[in-house]
Amino acid sequence: MKLFSLKPVTNSYDMVEWDILSFAEKIQPMLPSNQDACMFLLDIHMNNDSLLEYWPEGYELSFLPGYLKDNYDISIMDGFIALRMNAYEALKDLLAPLGEFIETKADGEPIVIFNLRTFGLEDEAKCEREYLDGYPLDYIKIAFINDDVKNKPVFKSKFTGGSRLYCTDKFKSAVDVVRM
């Protein structure tokens, strides 16, 4: 089994423009009174929180003009996966047990934002971390325990705050089959 790091296509654009600050203002009234919306959104991947329950009814996004030129059906966006409808239809059964689908629109076109809520178990002995003057920085190599991730086509790592996504060859093959 091969594992891959999911990253945006080099020199590409995110699918949608998502103004997180204005979004935070919209969801603040729906959050518990002691929860700051900006902190909630900053920590959503690490805390494995649901976004679906707070998604404002009728909230729409906009396609980024550069994205429309590339016209991909999938966009990896800081811990989320944005899917156009044909990508969603092709991948929904594979992704459904791993997170939540948030149906919305971008410029009137139906799209789905996938909030991954599945962690892979890291193999700490094989992970490598960068240090500066003895202080830990980012991980430069992440390894996972194969028995844990073999049935998780897409997953995230606690070592990266949950915002970097990883996948198995099963997910990669599913994407390749429909050429998204």
Question: PLM features: residue spans?
Answer:
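Phosphate/anion-contacting hairpin/loop surfaces
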Residues: 1-180
